[in-house]
Design a protein with these regions (language model features):
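N-terminal membrane-anchoring alpha-helices
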Residues: 1-64
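C-terminal domain-boundary segment and adjacent tail
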Residues: 49-70, 234-277
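Active-site beta->alpha N-cap acidic-glycine motif
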Residues: 50-139, 150-153, 157
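A cross-domain feature marking catalytic cores of carbohydrate-active enzymes
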Residues: 79-81, 106-108, 130-132, 170-173, ...
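Acidic-and-aromatic substrate-binding clefts and catalytic sites of carbohydrate-active enzymes
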Residues: 82-86, 106-114, 137-145, 170-178, ...
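A short acidic, helix-capping loop that chelates divalent metal ions and anchors anionic groups
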Residues: 135-142, 230-234
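Charged helix-capping and loop-helix junction motifs
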Residues: 146-151, 206-211, 237-244
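His/Asp/Glu-enriched short active-site or ligand-binding loop at hydrolase and phosphoryl-transfer sites
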Residues: 175, 180-217, 256-267
Length: 277
């Protein structure tokens, strides 16, 4: 709630800057450099917020699990950019061996291309969430209509093919702009980024990827790995093959439980219902 309030106040402040700058320019034409500078600074702030995946300035954003889930020592393992038929089946087998659940942020186009694999993810007890339809690298440059098309097409594809309706959205590379928040509200989606990531699309050293994920690891963390676009190790294997089992062993050693984001959401809702009014 505090983060949502901060987002609303920031939007009001941004609008006020524009109105004040315009009024000042009309009333005092010689003040136009100050007005232009204020507007430019405001837009620079908006751009910086969009380039910071964990920012909450542009709207509500899960960077950690809710308090109730954190108190239960839950951790969310999220896996992006699939499904990939060359990688995802083995990832599912690793999760099965450890009795772990994960959240797969899937690209809608890949869900359409690999329908049975997407259904298999859900059948094995994991959740599939929305990662846009085409994962365009320029997602943060899209206008509201194009952004809604990306989100909506993925939402429809995932729900139609798997029978599971996503509750969460993660922007491609985590980058976004102010148009995204109203789009997500329209589709009743919660933005989710991460607490820590392994940079496993560019780092082939499994030990280094693992260290990035477990350094400071605590209940409530949201961790990011990739089954799609995964870096390969010296043997040509996706780095997630080595990182994921070691990560799950580390979670068990620290008495942390991997859960889906949807399970964490339910846990938070149940805790709210139990709390005295």
């Amino acid at each position: 709630m505090a983060r949502q309030t901060a987002s609303v106040l920031w939007k009001i402040s941004s609008a006020a800057i524009h109105v004040t700058a315009a009024a000042a320019t009309v009333a005092h034409p010689h003040a136009w450099p100050w007005a232009l500078g204020a507007v430019a600074a405001n837009h620079a702030t908006i751009t910086a917020a969009g380039l910071w995946p964990r920012s909450t300035l542009l709207g509500p954003n899960w960077t950690r699990l809710p308090t109730a889930a954190a108190a239960e020592r839950s951790v969310a393992v999220s896996i992006d950019d699939g499904p990939d038929p060359a990688v995802t089946p083995h990832v599912l087998d690793i999760l099965d061996r450890h009795g772990a659940q994960a959240t797969f942020f899937c690209i809608g186009r890949r869900v359409v291309e690999h329908r049975e694999l997407a259904r298999e993810i859900v059948r094995r007890g994991h959740s599939i969430e929305n990662h846009s339809f085409g994962h365009p690298n320029y997602f943060s440059l899209l206008g509201p209509r194009a952004m809604a098309a990306q989100v909506g097409a993925a939402q429809e594809a995932i729900a139609t093919i798997t029978g599971y309706t996503p509750r969460f959205f993660r922007a491609p590379a985590g980058l976004r702009n102010p148009f995204l928040d109203p789009v997500l509200r329209r589709f009743e989606l919660q933005l989710a980024s991460w607490t820590r990531r392994g940079f496993d699309t560019v780092t082939s050293d499994a030990g280094l990827v693992l260290q990035r994920l477990v350094h400071g690891l605590a209940g409530g963390d949201i961790l990011l790995l990739h089954d799609g676009n995964a870096a390969r190790d010296a043997r040509g294997a996706p780095v997630i093959y080595e990182v994921l089992p070691r990560l799950l062993d580390e979670l068990a050693a620290r008495e942390l439980t991997p859960v889906t984001l949807n399970a964490a959401l339910r846990s938070s809702a149940n805790a709210s219902m139990r709390s005295p009014s």
